[in-house]
């Protein structure tokens, strides 16, 4: 079975939940193709980049024409089927052609499943799976179903009608999706975020009575929605009250410089360390040596 996983950007090294999914599917014998942009943090031989345009208007126009001609020669029936599906959804012809270009790299492949790893990546790709006679599924994660629809009302209306199956990381997110129109007749699977409890269990229960310095730990992507800046603000209050503590933050992401600035502004340079990305085997010792694990919610 051939599965296409659709990303906006390929998973970073800290997005272990996605990397583990890819690895697990391949271990079970599935043929996995990745569609996205950016750099892949781990080697994967089957990656396909989203179409990109460069140069002035004339150059971009030529690029679009060449891509569409190649697609029409390679997959004429799927291409016309896609346009027909778009038009039946009320999409203007010019926008249907734009979407055909946007999805040309997916339509040109033969897939059994098209899975959108983040819900919002399905926008303008609602008809891709049906056009290539594949089944469509998606994952419900926090931002894409809790915040994105608030900014883009009705964005998933067409999506729900074309889904074969839904994966959610919680019952709450699934309930939120139903408020936005997901019907109960679409099969859904709840797979909660988890860890290997056998690997991360302590070999022996150490004395966890607090020492002179309280040791905090967070393992997280450095992203605004993880609330790390609020965590730093809370810890600064502890420092003002005279508590001694250290705080290790493991992970990488786009907010590193902003968080470093916040650390400096809050006078936490001696207390807070940004460890960066670590492999799982190197994270275990941090858990064992910490007193309290912090997770913003």
Enumerate the language-model features and the residues they cover.
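N-terminal subdomain of nucleotide-sugar transferases
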Residues: 1-55, 109, 134, 288
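Short donor-sugar binding/catalytic loops of nucleotide-sugar-dependent glycosyltransferases
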Residues: 9-10, 219-224, 253, 278
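Donor nucleotide-sugar binding/catalytic pocket of nucleotide-sugar-dependent glycosyltransferases
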Residues: 36, 138-141, 153-202
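Membrane-proximal helix-turn-helix segments that form the acceptor-binding/catalytic region
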Residues: 100-109, 131, 135, 143-166
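Short His-centered aromatic/hydrophobic patch
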Residues: 116-122
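Conserved donor-binding/catalytic core segment of Leloir-type glycosyltransferases
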Residues: 167, 204-226, 232-237, 248, ...
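Nucleotide-activated donor-binding/catalytic signature segment of Leloir-type glycosyltransferases, i.e.
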Residues: 260-281
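Short alpha-helical donor nucleotide-sugar binding micro-motif in glycosyltransferases
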Residues: 277-278, 285-290
């Amino acid at each position: 079975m051939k599965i296409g996983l659709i990303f906006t950007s390929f998973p970073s090294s800290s997005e272990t939940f996605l990397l583990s999914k890819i690895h697990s599917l391949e271990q079970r014998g599935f043929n996995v193709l990745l569609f996205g942009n950016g750099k892949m943090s781990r080697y994967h031989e089957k990656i396909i980049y989203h179409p990109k345009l460069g140069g002035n208007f004339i150059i971009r126009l030529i690029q679009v024409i060449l891509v569409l001609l190649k697609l029409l020669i390679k997959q004429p029936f799927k291409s016309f089927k896609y346009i027909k599906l778009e038009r039946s959804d009320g999409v203007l012809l010019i926008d249907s052609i734009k979407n055909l270009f946007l999805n040309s790299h997916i339509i040109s492949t033969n897939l059994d499943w098209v899975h959108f790893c983040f819900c919002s990546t399905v926008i303008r790709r609602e008809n891709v799976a049906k056009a290539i006679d594949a089944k469509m599924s998606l994952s419900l994660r926090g931002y894409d179903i809790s915040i994105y629809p608030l900014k883009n009302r009705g964005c998933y209306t067409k999506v729900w009608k074309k889904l074969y199956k839904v994966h959610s990381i919680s019952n709450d997110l699934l309930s939120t999706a139903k408020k936005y129109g997901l019907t109960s007749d679409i099969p859904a699977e709840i797979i909660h975020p988890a860890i290997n409890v056998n690997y991360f269990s302590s070999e022996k229960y150490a004395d966890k009575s607090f020492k002179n310095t309280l040791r905090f730990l967070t393992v997280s992507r450095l992203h605004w929605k993880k609330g790390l800046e609020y965590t730093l603000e809370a810890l600064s209050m502890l420092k003002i009250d005279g508590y001694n503590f250290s705080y290790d933050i493991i992970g990488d992401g786009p907010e590193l410089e902003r968080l470093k600035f916040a650390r400096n502004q809050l006078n936490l340079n001696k207390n807070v360390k940004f460890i960066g990305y670590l492999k799982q085997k190197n994270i275990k010792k941090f858990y064992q040596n910490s007193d309290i694990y912090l997770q913003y919610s």
